[in-house]
A protein has these predicted regions:
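Membrane-integral, polyisoprenol-dependent glycosyltransferases
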Residues: 1-167
């Protein structure tokens, strides 16, 4: 309802539920669903699309990270096989599919944290390639920001705790 009212009123700053201000949740999910409503019209399908795209982005990012981290001496078929298997397992896991089909902020939080941690992994393990390391740092910062916009400070706290625990 909040994204629909954002689209109808044109006010993308103040979330409203039945005409009343509604600041119970951060705005990222509202913005993504509202943008989808503007592009595809107001429908259940358009409401679910942003979460599905977020889930899909993590699957492809995991695939790409596994290819980037594969040893150079390993055969291409082994690299592709491992990356495909891991990304496929994530893509077909019931929890990932279930949250990816629903229009709730939990998938935006999970995707933001996952992409941030994948960015950290890229920056940490690819020190030999400066551009990949920089890309990892940018991804870490960008997707921590997305996670904060999706669910609040927990979007920064969880990746931070994981990284501190790892280091």
């Amino acid at each position: 309802e909040v994204p629909r009212q954002m689209v109808l009123s044109g006010d993308w700053v103040t979330p409203r539920w039945n005409g009343e201000t509604f600041f119970d949740y951060p705005v990222w999910g509202y913005w993504m669903v509202g943008l989808s409503f503007q592009v595809f019209g107001i429908s259940e399908w358009a409401a679910r699309l942003p979460a599905a795209l977020a889930a899909t982005a993590v699957v492809f990012a995991l695939f790409g990270l596994l290819l980037a981290l594969a040893p150079a001496q390993e055969s291409v078929s082994d690299r592709l096989g491992r990356a495909t298997l891991c990304a496929g397992l994530l893509a077909l896991s019931p929890g990932w599919v279930g949250w990816g089909r629903s229009s709730v902020t939990d998938m935006f939080l999970a995707s933001g944290i996952s992409l941030a941690l994948l960015g950290f992994a890229l920056a940490y393990w690819r020190r030999d390639r400066p551009w990949l390391r920089q890309l990892g740092h940018v991804a870490l910062a960008l997707f921590c920001g997305v996670a904060v916009l999706a669910k609040g400070p927990v979007g920064l706290l969880l990746p931070g705790l994981v990284i501190i625990g790892f280091l």
